[in-house]
Amino acid sequence: MGRIAYREADVDLMARMMRAEAEGEGKQGMLYVGNVIVNRVVADCGDFIDLRTVDDVIFHVQGGNYSFEAVQKGNMFYQRARETERKLARQTLESWRSHPAKYALWYFNPYAPCPPTWYDQLFRSIYGSLFL
């Protein structure tokens, strides 16, 4: 059994999100995004209470916005998943975890504007994204 229960539709959905959020960071960056998605399903705390599925996490709304910008903006998220990303998604759902995203629940682009509430938090930078 994987880290969480999932269906083939979850593999596809997660693969699309991993590509939309991190294609520019390569396979490793996409795996990190997948790690964050699975961690949110597992977390059951704070902002992620009652999120039990990949679908719940990806379409979660916080403060009036989707948690993942790609859902709101569309970009590559609404394109079909490619087999490369599907394999990465399956790998993450089954067992893959790595530092700095091993327990991460968020990530963001350090070069983009961010809300003031994000300042003074501990983070780790790798592959162009920051992990909290």
Tell where the protein language model's regions lie, with residue ranges.
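Bacterial extracytoplasmic/cell-wall-associated proteins, especially those involved in peptidoglycan
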Residues: 2-132
